[in-house]
């Protein structure tokens, strides 16, 4: 007579809750530490996890090396965006941005240094902050999101110094033209707007969906991602992923991908994009698809390139989105492994 296989011991309530959290997790944002050896990831539960890239990439790495060094509750709602200065990690959620000291987080002391809320129109308004952008030359931070405005904060004093108005719906993404003091913003209204930081005025508007070759009405007009490289911009979302010549406001390359893209970046002579679907796409500027590299998440929301010169051994691409995992690509050709909350 066969022996009955004993049932698994029921998990405790905490373990069940954590397993359900991981099952329904979305990772919205990532940021590399100033030393290049650590990666912060922010999720839909308001948690930030700090991973040790140097440990995970080591030849002696174990499964435990791919788990967070520390995880802490940073916001009440999702952590939509993060950036790092030479000392701080800045994180944004619903209505406010917070600062954390990298040195303290790595010692597992996760106490916020400060928090700031932009001057919203009413005290009842708590719009999400979808995008953060550092402007190193003026030591400032630009925040944008659900109130359809760009707010500039002086990082030295913590005061808000300017508001840029023009979008008619919420803003998804920001990019900096480093050679000129200009910022690009893309939003739900289907427009990419260029702002001159010297005059605090809008100097150019590209309504992408109005260009027939880019328009995809069934996907909507929203702009979910953009990046710039001097005179060139690439953007996507509802409309097709498109490379634009900024001076002439003309689309030069339409990239042949149907799925809406949520993140895009220039890398050397390539453009990297990700969105609906599990692949990181590598494009030639001509529009040719060089490679599609599958990851472990069904959809991707965030790409991060670690190019910190202080840690060349940690030079990796990381991708995250609709799962509890952060995929690590040690070269662009394949996924080496995944970090996990």
UniProtKB/Swiss-Prot annotation:
GO terms for cellular component: nuclear body; nuclear speck; nucleoplasm; nucleus; THO complex; THO complex part of transcription export complex; transcription export complex. It comes from the Eukaryota. InterPro entries: THOC6, WD40/YVTN_repeat-like_dom_sf, WD40_repeat_CS, WD40_repeat_dom_sf, WD40_rpt. Gene3D superfamilies: YVTN repeat-like/Quinoprotein amine dehydrogenase (2.130.10.10). SUPFAM superfamilies: WD40 repeat-like. GO terms for biological process: apoptotic process; central nervous system development; mRNA export from nucleus; mRNA processing; RNA splicing. Pfam families: WD40. It is found in: Nucleus; Nucleus speckle. WD repeats lie at residues 22-61, 74-112, 124-165, 166-205, 215-254, 256-293, 295-339. Changing residue 46 to R: In BBIS; localizes to the cytoplasm and not to the nucleus. PROSITE patterns: WD_REPEATS_1 (PS00678), WD_REPEATS_2 (PS50082), WD_REPEATS_REGION (PS50294). The modification Phosphoserine is found at residue 180. GO terms for molecular function: RNA binding. Keywords: Apoptosis, Developmental protein, Disease variant, Intellectual disability, mRNA processing, mRNA splicing, mRNA transport, Nucleus, Phosphoprotein, Repeat, RNA-binding, Transport, WD repeat. Belongs to the WD repeat THOC6 family. Component of the THO subcomplex, which is composed of THOC1, THOC2, THOC3, THOC5, THOC6 and THOC7. The THO subcomplex interacts with DDX39B to form the THO-DDX39B complex which multimerizes into a 28-subunit tetrameric assembly. Component of the transcription/export (TREX) complex at least composed of ALYREF/THOC4, DDX39B, SARNP/CIP29, CHTOP and the THO subcomplex; in the complex interacts with THOC5; together with THOC5 and THOC7, plays a key structural role in the oligomerization of the THO-DDX39B complex. TREX seems to have a dynamic structure involving ATP-dependent remodeling. Component of the THO subcomplex of the TREX complex which is thought to couple mRNA transcription, processing and nuclear export, and which specifically associates with spliced mRNA and not with unspliced pre-mRNA. Plays a key structural role in the oligomerization of the THO-DDX39B complex. It is linked to Beaulieu-Boycott-Innes syndrome: An autosomal recessive neurodevelopmental disorder characterized by delayed development, moderate intellectual disability, and dysmorphic facial features. Other developmental anomalies, such as cardiac and renal defects, may also occur. This is THO complex subunit 6. The gene is THOC6.
């Amino acid at each position: 007579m066969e022996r009955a296989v004993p049932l698994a011991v029921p998990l405790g309530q905490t373990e069940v809750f954590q397993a359900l959290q991981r099952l329904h997790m979305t990772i919205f944002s990532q940021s590399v530490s100033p030393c290049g050896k650590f990666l912060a990831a922010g999720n839909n539960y308001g948690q930030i996890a700090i991973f040790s890239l140097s440990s995970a990439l080591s030849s002696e790495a174990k499964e435990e090396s791919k788990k967070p060094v520390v995880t802490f509750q940073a916001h009440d709602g999702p952590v939509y965006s993060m950036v790092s200065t030479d000392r701080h990690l800045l994180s944004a959620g619903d209505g406010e941005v917070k600062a954390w000291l990298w040195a303290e987080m790595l010692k597992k002391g996760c106490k916020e240094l400060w928090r700031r809320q932009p001057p919203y129109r009413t005290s009842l308004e708590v719009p999400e902050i979808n995008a953060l952008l550092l402007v190193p030359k003026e030591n400032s931070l630009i925040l944008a999101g659900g109130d359809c405005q760009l707010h500039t904060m002086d990082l030295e004093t913590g005061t808000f110094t300017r508001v840029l108005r023009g979008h008619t719906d919420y803003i998804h993404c920001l990019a900096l033209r480093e050679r000129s003091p200009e910022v690009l913003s893309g939003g739900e209204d289907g427009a990419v707007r260029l702002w001159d930081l010297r005059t605090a005025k809008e100097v150019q508007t590209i309504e992408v969906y109005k260009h027939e070759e880019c328009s995809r009405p069934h996907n909507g007009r929203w702009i979910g991602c953009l990046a710039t490289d001097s005179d060139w911009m690439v953007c996507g979302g509802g409309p097709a992923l498109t490379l634009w010549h900024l001076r002439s406001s003309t689309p030069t390359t339409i990239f042949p991908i149907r799925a809406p893209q949520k993140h895009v970046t220039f890398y050397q002579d390539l453009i990297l994009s990700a969105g609906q679907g599990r692949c990181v796409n590598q494009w030639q500027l001509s529009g040719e698809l060089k490679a599609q590299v599958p990851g472990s998440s069904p959809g991707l929301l965030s790409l991060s390139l670690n190019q910190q010169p202080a840690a060349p051994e940690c030079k990796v691409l990381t991708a995250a989105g609709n799962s509890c995992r952060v995929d690590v690509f040690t070269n662009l050709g394949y996924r080496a492994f995944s970090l996990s909350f």
